[in-house]
Amino acid sequence: MIQRMVFLAALLGVATLTACTSMTSSDAARFDAIVASPVRIDADRRTDAARHPTQFLPFTQVKPGMRALDVSAGGGYTSQLMALAVGPSGVLYAQAPNPGATLTRRLADHPQANFVVVARPFDDPVPPEAHDLDVITLIQNYHDIANLPVDRVRMNRQLYAALKPGGHYIVVDHAARAGTGTADTRTLHRIDEAVVRNEVTQAGFVLEAEGSFLRNPDDPRDKTSGDSPFFTDKFALRFVKPR
């Protein structure tokens, strides 16, 4: 009986995830148009094969008019996608402690009023004007933050406070072997998925969905993410702030 209940619960979880990520033809066309936008740089397009943007975007639940924050924006790959997804009626804040040239050059080449770069520390990543957010992304950099003297509990709580009830926090990263914790964050640039789940839910978030679109079961997860001869196994987690 217990095994049957566990099996049914698993089926319900899969059904819920399928329902959350289902798209209409107009949604699919919108995401295709975002990925094809001439605003995106060549480096973005070369990265698409490893990032699967047409699957990532619906997973985030982003819609036009939303208020979004991309934490640890790096060169702006995710920030640009999200800025295009929220559109001119929305706003995307791209956070970085020290915004780099690739990120700032995007706006110099293609000014976008809804794409706002903010220099903020990870301990206090949310600018005062970025309240009532609909979605927050932290993509492939949670492991890097773990290498810094950053209070991740404080960071996640600040992100929780900045979101609207029902808002989403998306974390994607290179998967380390189960049980390794943060041991591989500096050497292999990977993190144990369980660490992220635990730290984020401690801030009050609830895990709503897991994405399989970046999974690679053939990855032994024992090589540096940048040196892997194939696409790394990545987890994609969507957390929600309860209503």
Residue ranges and their predicted role:
Residues 17-19:
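C-terminal motif of bacterial Sec signal peptides marking the signal peptidase cleavage site
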Residues 166-174:
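Conserved beta-strand signature within the Rossmann-like core of class I S-adenosyl-L-methionine
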Residues 126-136:
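A short acidic, Gly/Pro-enriched loop at the edge of an enzyme's catalytic core
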Residues 65-74:
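Conserved class I S-adenosyl-L-methionine
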Residues 134-153:
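A short SAM/SAH-binding and catalytic strip from SAM-dependent methyltransferases
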Residues 31-57:
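Class I SAM-dependent methyltransferase Rossmann-like catalytic core
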Residues 83, 152-165:
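A short glycine-rich, Lys/Arg-flanked "PGG" loop and its adjoining helix->strand segment in the class I
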Residues 219-243:
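Core SAM-dependent methyltransferase catalytic element
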